Design a protein with these regions (language model features):
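Acidic, low-complexity terminal tails and accessory targeting/binding regions
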Residues: 2-24, 98, 105-117, 164, ...
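Phosphate-coordination/substrate-recognition cap region in phosphate-metabolizing enzymes
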Residues: 15-17, 21-22, 61-128, 243
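Short, hydrophobic/glycine-enriched beta-strand segments
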Residues: 24-32
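Generic beta-sheet signal
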Residues: 27, 164-172
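Loop-to-helix element that buttresses phosphate recognition and phosphoryl-transfer chemistry
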Residues: 34-85, 89, 139-151
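Short active-site segment of divalent metal-dependent hydrolases/proteases
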Residues: 35, 174-175
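Glycine-rich phosphate-binding loop signature in dinucleotide/nucleotide-binding domains
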Residues: 68-70, 157-164
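Phosphate-handling substructures
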Residues: 91-152, 215-216, 225-229, 234
Length: 244
């Protein structure tokens, strides 16, 4: 009698496990690869900035990393660097790259200007008025607005790949902000401390509609220039913001 009950319990557990597995969805937020930007411009949402040769290698590395994953949906920011990073992933899974405007880079008043350490836009007094409130921030798109649109993009990707996995290619700041929100950290932060290297994956696991875990991987970290890696110290004349 006891043995029979145990077998029944096992069967019920297996059914529950199978049902639960079907309702597990993973959404990978991928930061694009390195961009060709020899002038060191903070390009932001400006069109015309494409992946460098190294950036294309990073994109290929991401595709290799995800080749055996159950990817059924690939979507990207409308900016060229994001589309070009998404393309190898989509190709390896026989998919098209969809576009979601909500994955776009954060707006920034310094777009089009150089923004290095010890030089560039911050040395000009006319720009100091934009630096009055780091909590909003005063120089760009409010953090809370980034959270709203990025959560919307994540939820849409989850629904499109329900029970499978989705890839969303976006940009450093919005990826970091939405991760900070999900992990219940404050949204204002030191940009040098963002854990969001070029061609990295920030992966959100959903059970049903609820995020139950967040993971982070760097499949192309060996290709990333040292000054652009997470936690690296800034170098004069170079900015981590260039690859945002």
């Amino acid at each position: 009698m006891t043995d029979k009950k145990t077998e029944t319990e096992k069967t019920e557990t297996e059914k529950t496990d199978r049902a639960g597995t079907k309702d597990i969805t993973v959404v990978h937020l991928v930061r694009h690869g390195e961009v060709h930007n020899p002038q060191g411009v903070l390009y932001g949402r400006r069109p015309g900035y494409h992946l460098s040769d190294l950036g294309r290698k990073m994109a290929d590395r991401v595709a290799e990393h995800l080749e055996k994953r159950d990817i059924t949906h690939v979507v990207a920011s409308p900016l060229e660097r994001a589309q070009e990073t998404a393309a190898p992933v989509a190709t390896s899974h026989g998919l098209d790259v969809a576009v979601d405007e909500r994955l776009i880079e954060a707006a920034n008043v310094f777009e089009g200007k150089t923004f290095g350490v010890g030089d560039g836009a911050l040395r000009k007094p006319d720009n100091w008025k934009h630096l009055t409130n780091p909590f909003k921030p005063s120089w760009g798109e409010p953090y809370i607005e980034q959270v709203v649109r990025m959560m919307g993009a994540l939820d849409a990707a989850r629904d499109a790949a329900r029970g499978h996995e989705a890839v969303c290619v976006s940009h450093q700041l919005p990826i970091w902000i939405v991760r900070s929100f999900v992990e219940r950290r404050r949204l204002w932060h030191d940009p040098r401390r963002r854990q969001c290297t070029l061609a990295s994956l920030t992966s959100f696991t959903y059970q049903g509609d609820k995020i139950v875990s967040v993971g982070y991987t760097e499949p192309a970290v060996d290709l990333v220039p040292p000054h652009l890696r997470a936690g690296a110290k800034p170098v004069k004349g170079k900015s981590k913001a260039f690859g945002a």
